[in-house]
Amino acid sequence: MYKNKNGDLNNISGANIAKIRKSFSPTMSQRALADKLQLYGLDLDKNAIQRIECGKRFVTDIELVVFAETLNVSVLELISSPCHS
């Protein structure tokens, strides 16, 4: 069985999702992102998005594709080394 050796970090996309979400003007809230994700068929609530952005929740490949479509970025942008400020 696979053991995650990254401590509490369960994804590398969360920091990028948060940075991209916050880059919108006006800033997109986690609730607004959850609402947009539902339009693409992904049912996540604000709390799930918060856990993803903090690296506390795993993200599936299907979820990554929907996040990318919703945020209008490539999947590669979401899984690249976390964005720098």
Indicate where each model-derived feature is located:
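Residue-level detection of the helix-turn-helix DNA-binding "recognition helix"
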Residues: 22, 38, 54, 83
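DNA major-groove recognition helix of helix-turn-helix
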Residues: 53, 63, 79-82
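DNA major-groove recognition helix of helix-turn-helix/homeodomain DNA-binding modules
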Residues: 36, 60-77
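A short, Lys/Arg-rich alpha-helix, primarily the initiator
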Residues: 1-26
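Short, charged recognition helix plus adjacent turn
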Residues: 2-7, 69, 76-85
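Short alpha-helical DNA-recognition segment
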Residues: 26-51
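Short alpha-helical elements of helix-turn-helix
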Residues: 15, 31, 47, 61-64
